[in-house]
């Protein structure tokens, strides 16, 4: 596409080339030695659309790729070496005579003649009509007219010779012009681009034995010049032009590349880095994704003539929009070889094993494979195997574009991909012979056998691309190994392949109204279903359908037109009816019509402007497609619209016409609105952008721009309310409003006061000034008539400007004529350039090819600068200023700015456009993102309070109100000022002294509003005391430091009032919105200024300012002392440049939300704003209240409480007010609560009673906090990082309401036992309490020692090993120790220090089993029948009493017994009952377990059938068991929740609930009350003294065990047997109750020494020693035992009047069962002989 570019292609010029066209004689163009005389031509029509057929996907023909598929498309034949050609001896066939050229190295060269004539028409089908001659004669001239499919009617005029190279790319001269730098007979040639869409291509008639050399585009030639093309070739190379067929192996290798010929001198020249881009020849064919590198080939440039440096190589096949050649790109060829003679190479890719990385380009992978391995080879196979349904669709598409065969297999079949690849490898070996190369991309060892055969049996060269974990068996068979990870290490990201969503609408009319909409919708859906239509809406007799693209919509229009829908013939149209677009409303402007909402029109006529023939699209068309049909004014109804192309053309005409109408309407605006400077103009237009309507109601209620300019009642109402409005600034009259209204802007229906304001250097007024340029052009010409601009960014600024300009010139000139290259100045390291191309097509080609092209060390960003975009830059500039002026410090993060812009103006922001506003904004890289900052030249002077939002506080729905700077204001009030002779220019600001006053805001605020009312909304600050005194009484002035507050600060504390600075430097008191605030306004001071969100440096500076001023008396410091005070306070310099400013005052004004500048001149003072003071007081007050035990304080005691909390006296002026009530009233009720108690005002924190569930969740949250902080260095983290860390650690949000809190800090304060919040200045740090830190470091030591050999570590190595293991050092001072041994003392429950020969060694202690201890403690608690709880100390004493051993928690890994019990949260609860002593009790679930244990103790062998459990439990406890009360669904689940107590054995209805062996032991001691007694079971024996003795009920035996006295631990237990009741009838004679299971006898446990279980005792008790107890003796035994129980005396070994046989020592042990699971229990024999049945009643007869 070398449009109109003149190149000197020869070192000589010929005069006959300069002749006029009428003097031109026809010349013959001889192609005689390109074809044999004996060969015949083939018809042209048969191959007309072969190039289209070759675009089919490779997946469909993956296994049968044609051998000559690629050779049909511009085969890139490599240039052979001259010397091998000369060595070959070939029989030549007779050829035509040729003439000689003086420039050739040999004497005989063929000549080609091209004549030029007028009026000649050549039909492609008759180009070759002779069978017997080798000469082709064709005339080329200005009268040429080839049949064309181009849709363009009027291509640009051409001069000189129409580009031969671009118009005949398929003939033998296809590349001669663009490639030859030597055309001795042509002189100068002018290249011209192809305009329009892709033209139909006609194949050159192929000879029978020769491959076709190319295709002809049918294009239009408008002008031309004579030219004679003589090509020179050595005689030794003559035979290479006879036949181009690769099948004729007997013929010498051809040196003709697509019809180009070379002389031997040129072939012997060294290569040059040159490039001729394909877009110059085929401009409208989109280039494929595959970019093959060029090989530089010397081209005939005439003998002794040097070639220019802007060509790279010959034509690249991959850049022509066609499939790459079968045998690769031209670079894979080696000189002296023909493609067929090159060894074949095949690539076999297991893409499931070696996949393309996510988000990376498969094109780049294929390209690298071809570049690395294909040199000197021809591509014979390139296949990858995968399940295309499982693979990424974009990867598959990219592989198809690269002409890679994608073989589909079923992923569910085992080794399906491997089998397919192995089959392909075998086929490759059968087809090709050595030498051949196989490239396998896989790591699967299954290919080892195939690779071995290919290498050793077939002699192939094997290249293996594998991953790191490849097997040695696979690697052994490869000649060359390539690591896949390194091979794809720096792949470029994948560019999005999807086209932007572009929907097309169809409008259907004449639908039946007597049918329901659902039926009509179904009918329409059936009609349009084949075309992918979707019914959007049905309204009355019309409907709207949406289609994905233009073609689908046109097919549906043809199908649906005049179709029958329930008896009605429907009408289908691409555009809505005229009445929908042109609804007029009454207006003061004549001829103004109702315009449909831009949003609706955008929705209804959003057109997909694509090129059917596949021409390139510029990136600029994405945003400009489908702006709608209407502009301001009337819209012409499109008549007989048959296609969307016509609609597009109609749209451009309509916009042009409506622009004229709009200009006429604008001229009708009353002139006084713009001419009279004193008349305020109040327009209530709302800002809206493209695609956003001014009013988002139905189209009948929408108003046009012109209607909003009229004097509507709304406008009048606003004017009446705005009593005190600032007049039109006179400065505006000095500026010219030279803004042109682009068609894009007109069609937006928006008139932004901020965007149209000409005063960009100052803050715009809240009033709306419509400054319109009436001289804007009505007939807008083609925006690209004078060329297309290309914007280039991300340029390497390290390169010199000269080098950059030259590089850009050369790079872009390859794609077309470059008019100029402009470089922007180096600004903030953002160097940008603008390249102007000759026409749009060249610019599009350059953008597509050079985007992300690497120049220097950076990849440039290339975008097309459309005309509309250029003209809207002024609009974007004003919109950007309007947003950034309202931002703190005039800076916003890029993401925040984009969000505000799109929400405010309703359209997408092109970030690249921001870089074009070099005179308005600067974009800096800061932190993790980019910052958009307004340049000082565009900034307005900030008022001390910054800007304000509207009263509703919503910046999303309406534009924030910006403070205007008054152009001029009188320095004093002429009416009330005592010194009325003040002259402005003689006033010295340094003489102004800031007055201090003592005033209550409660009375002062209404007085200030009253003053503003009487002074028409503005009062000069200088005369405010005089005005106040005239209206009210004198101000109570005090000297500085005498308990007063600066008057200027007090005024800003008044809601709705602000102090602005006029341009003459005078401070003026005024209302924020030029009128009194409404009574329902939210506190306006909260809305005055915003924190600099996203600017971390300014945020940090604002915190430093607060911290600095807090330390100053009354929070006031002079400006002159700020720098030294800052340096002294923070021990660092305050460098203004670090924050992006050049002056200190600019930096101070950048934080108006915290800093207020008082006074004028050099004696200005700095203080905190009222907002910052309220926030600071709120924090201090909360800290004070939380320090009180009752979380409240009486107002009278506030001074004392403040002094006690902060160690300083209370001074209300420290917070910028004169009374405590003034600042307390500013705090929301949700933070502080004021209440009246006993005639005293009390300040307290509002509390909400939390539910029990929330309390339980808070306990769980405390454990989560401990877990989270244990993973942090030093068990601490910043407060601000807790929420994201919590979300990342637990995978869920931390919802405060879930725990019953509204603030995170309050939630932390609810868990003081595990977490404490430390305040380090303004930053809060979360850390574990000391106890939790010790636990955490103990856990770390356990982990550390267990990772060491022998679980021990030398003490000297502890700190280094700790740092190595956990990544941070161990800070001993965190644990209040100064040495490692001292820390070990605190961790004595975890580790112990042992002295060894090599030094002190740290070892883990041997912990005892916590499970055994848990069971023992559980039995103790279940046997306790006193209160429902007992103290921890009592539990420890009882344990030591029962088990006769001390309970040391350290032996179990705990510091205290309380911590041990807290580690069993599901078994016991530890609590404090209002005192310091801690108590323990069973949980609700284990209270149920206690009842179950007691119940099972009443049964034989402590077991019961499961189906009888509910009834027995209800009888035993007297209550119905509800499993859901314990969080279980059924009884079985409930019993399974207490595995420490019971277990269920058996199956089906025979399941039995069995008491665990650990729970069967029952203790009784004088100091430990007996449990397990219930009144209604008859299990208690009452004697006449009222004593109670426990007996097991419902059993056939009774056992009473007296506890062993503490002073005689080795004394044997005495067992007394008695009958269960006083009845004289023996229980054995009684019938067995039906509810009891059959009795079973079980012996006492036998000691291990007794090996023989059936052996009788060595000393049996004689019967004479046994005696029968009478009833009286029994009663005495019971009485005596009970007395001993109650008195706590030691039980004697014998009872009175009772002879008890002494028990064997083996019987002193308790009933011990296996402590493990019941499965370990020994099997019971059915027959048990000679055992000690202690449970049976002993009866002597």
Swiss-Prot record:
The record, for CDD domains, names: LOTUS_1_Limkain_b1, LOTUS_2_Limkain_b1, LOTUS_3_Limkain_b1, LOTUS_4_Limkain_b1, LOTUS_5_Limkain_b1, LOTUS_6_Limkain_b1, LOTUS_7_Limkain_b1, LOTUS_8_Limkain_b1
Q: Write out the ranges of the annotated region (Disordered).
A: 594-636, 659-678, 683-716, 1684-1727
Q: Which part of the chain is the HTH OST-type domain?
A: 872-946, 1000-1076, 1097-1171, 1173-1248, 1257-1332, 1333-1408, 1409-1483, 1484-1558
Q: Where is the NYN domain?
A: 345-482
What is any one GO biological process for this UniProt entry?
A: oogenesis
UniProt GO molecular function: CCR4-NOT complex binding; RNA binding; RNA nuclease activity
Q: Which Pfam families match?
A: MARF1_LOTUS, NYN, OST-HTH, RRM_MARF1
Instruction: Identify the domain of life.
Output: Eukaryota
Provide the protein name: Meiosis regulator and mRNA stability factor 1
- What species is this protein from? Gallus gallus (Chicken)
